[in-house]
Design a protein with these regions (language model features):
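Glycine-rich phosphate-binding loop of actin/hexokinase-like ATP-binding domains
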Residues: 153-250
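Phosphate/pyrophosphate-binding loops at sites that engage ATP/ADP/AMP, CoA/4′-phosphopantetheine
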Residues: 77-88, 192-195, 307-318
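Adenine-nucleotide phosphate-binding core of ATP-dependent small-molecule kinases
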Residues: 262, 266-273, 279-313
Length: 335
């Protein structure tokens, strides 16, 4: 937070494997104001497009086949063409910080190398984030750039929730529940008052989905685990499965480790059940398509189970919050 009278302009980047979201904020001691926000969708495809919104105005630009680096260049040009204030700091959402990175951290080469070592823990997310950080460092070599980690919020989770029932040496090596969507959970808490209600459950429901039980501002449990692939079913991710099923697929169905990872991360969840990971499409199809209706029912069922478990963990509930694209825009899931 800047000192009184000082103004920072922060560019916030959320880079995924297929999309780039960005927003420019004026930040003062009294709060922040969004100056512009944008999105580049369908990265790497012929249909890739960039959109920038400044107030009531919107600008679009085609960027067919754009890589993450090229998409960032388009986003930077769009911002510069609108004569917006130049960023004084860049913040990057980073999905996984492992055990080492528990607070926002200045981005430099050693940090990037340490994040590369974590790619096996978040193979869908970290390569894109690292590419984005490298591109932003190249574009603005003298600008402070900060990595903000989704895992930080859950770092003080009680050991009984963080630990898996596997040999102790694995826990000592970092095999534990890390939890994700922490930046979203922190933001939600900041909107609930100071101090926030004591017992809160947040359901962050988007293409990636998780829930968290929060007591007195502290994460006490969350559905995602060692990787962002655990927990409830998601757009293309399976969520939690019987480990015996994975052994069966490896031994009896001819899956390799890589093909099994692809199955669980990119071919499962809503997509595997109903042929689409887009909840909007599934809602439209549900009245006449049994698989679409089943996918919605299964996701809702798993969310209800998680909420019920967390009410028991917290000993009651003061506030239930839905956020994320599905959480905000799909009433049938909230019901």
């Amino acid at each position: 937070v800047p000192e009184a009278g000082r103004v920072n302009v922060a560019l916030c980047l959320n880079i995924g494997s297929s999309s780039l979201k960005f927003a420019l904020f004026r930040v003062t001691a009294s709060g922040e104001a969004c100056l512009a926000s944008g999105l580049v969708e369908q990265l790497g495809t012929p249909g890739a497009r960039a959109q920038l919104k400044v107030g009531a105005n919107s600008v679009e630009r085609a960027c067919a086949g754009a890589s993450i680096s090229a998409a960032l260049s388009v986003a930077f040009r769009l911002l510069e063409e609108q004569s917006l204030p130049r960023a004084t700091v860049v913040g990057h959402r980073v999905v996984h910080g492992g055990r080492e990175h528990l607070t926002p951290t200045a981005i430099d080469r050693p940090l990037l190398e340490s994040l590369r070592a974590l790619i096996p823990l978040a193979p869908l997310h970290l390569p894109a984030a690292i590419s984005g950080m490298e591109a932003a460092l190249e574009h603005w070599p003298g600008l402070p750039q900060i990595a903000c980690f989704d895992t930080s919020f859950h770092a003080r989770m009680p050991e009984c929730a963080a630990r898996f029932p596997v040999p102790a040496q694995l826990f000592d090596q970092g095999v534990r529940r890390y939890g994700f969507h922490g930046l979203s959970y922190e933001y939600v808490l900041s909107t609930l008052g100071d101090p926030p209600p004591r017992r809160v459950i947040v359901a962050h429901l988007g293409n990636g989905a998780s829930l968290a039980a929060i007591e007195a501002g502290r994460s006490v449990d969350t559905t995602m685990g060692f990787t962002p692939g655990g927990g409830i079913l998601m757009g293309t991710r399976s969520g939690d499965l019987d480990p015996g099923l994975l052994l069966y697929l490896l031994r009896e169905n001819g899956y390799s480790v890589d093909s099994l990872e692809h199955l669980l991360e990119r071919e499962s969840g809503l997509l595997g059940i109903a042929g689409s990971s887009d909840m909007r499409q599934l809602v439209e199809r549900a009245e006449h398509d049994e698989r679409a209706a089943l996918a919605i029912e299964m996701m809702g069922y798993q969310i209800r189970k998680a909420i019920g478990a967390y009410v028991a963990v917290l000993g009651g509930l003061d506030v239930l919050v839905f956020t994320g694209g599905i959480g905000e825009h799909t009433p049938s899931i909230r019901r």
